[in-house]
């Protein structure tokens, strides 16, 4: 999110980045986190910002977009930008996760994968989620194959997405959604399904890209940047209602 944060700050926005519980240096706690922990973190940040700043815009990418949608249904702000919003996978297994977490509690996601850490994209992805690994250590691929994740964590992601879909019908603030046409994670048809449930005004833009829309080295970056900055420039602060 840093390139976008810097672009917004250069336009005069006060920017606050948010690291969700269980990510970054807190990764060891990820298996024990729940969807409510992530949503509460976003909501608390909005509670702090809303009295001091206006307009207030929330920007979320991937699962963060779904969490943002849920949060703004509870805390009124002025605008929401969702980039590559991930809220569910169109697979048979997805709605079965509550059952699967009881039958197969542990998953080794990289057990059968060929992990080539000489590939810059592979290094980039793994270092984003596992900042403490050494990609140059020849033992790292073997260690990653032993890495275990509880199925329950994926079920919490499912719960967060379901909550976002249900919240969409209650949100009326302006919304920008940027979707990669080649995104295999947050698939375009799933994003369009989510937006059909949204109650407020929607600006929807598809770009020729995959899931990572914030890589400043990719050709699509300038387009994404321009879309968000233009959307932000049109927002007007909504008066805070004191009850």
Where are these regions (language model features)?
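Active-site nucleophile elbow and catalytic-triad environment of alpha/beta-hydrolase enzymes
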Residues: 149-168
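Catalytic histidine neighborhood in serine/cysteine hydrolases
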Residues: 16-17, 192-213
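Short beta-strand/loop motif that positions the catalytic acidic residue
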Residues: 171, 177-179, 183
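Catalytic histidine-centered segment of alpha/beta-hydrolase-like enzymes
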Residues: 209-223
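Alpha/beta-hydrolase-fold enzymes
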Residues: 63-147
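Conserved alpha/beta-hydrolase "acid-adjacent" motif
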Residues: 184-190
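Catalytic nucleophile-loop/oxyanion-hole region of alpha/beta-hydrolase
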Residues: 26-57
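Short, surface-exposed "cap/lid" segments of acyl-processing enzymes
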Residues: 1-26
